[in-house]
Structure formats: C-alpha cells, structure tokens
A protein has these predicted regions:
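N-terminal acidic leader/helix
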Residues: 1-33
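Short, charged, amphipathic alpha-helical segments
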Residues: 12, 36-47
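Generic structural signal for well-ordered, non-transmembrane alpha-helical segments
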Residues: 16-19, 44-51
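Hydrophobic stripe of amphipathic alpha-helices that form coiled-coil interfaces
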Residues: 32, 39, 53-56
C-alpha cells in the first residue's frame, strides 16, 4: 500500500495543492517570472509540507 492511499480527503487535497504550487513555481522560473532561488525556496517548502503529510499517513 502506498502512503497516499492512507490520506484523508483534506490531506489529499493539501498534497495536490502543494504539488500544483511546486509545479507552478517551476513553470514561473522557466518563463523568467521568478528567480531560480525563489523557485528553489517554493519547491523546498512544498516538498517539506508533503513529507510531513506523508509521515503522518504512514
């Protein structure tokens, strides 16, 4: 069983939102709307949040 199968609906929605935010940061960086440093900061923050949710679901 994968960790995401244990998520509540609210946690699943939160993970999805973090994944979208992370993806949008990479797109914004690729199009020159934000710096690489800003993109890295957003990606790191989203990854940490997803990891915390995953650890709670494991």
């Amino acid at each position: 069983m994968n960790w995401h199968e244990n998520l509540s609906e609210a946690d699943n929605k939160a993970v999805t939102n973090y994944e979208v935010e992370r993806s949008n940061a990479l797109v914004d960086w690729a199009h020159g709307r934000i710096s690489m440093a800003e993109a890295r900061e957003i990606v790191a923050r989203c990854n940490k949040a997803i990891q915390r949710i995953a650890e709670g679901a494991a």
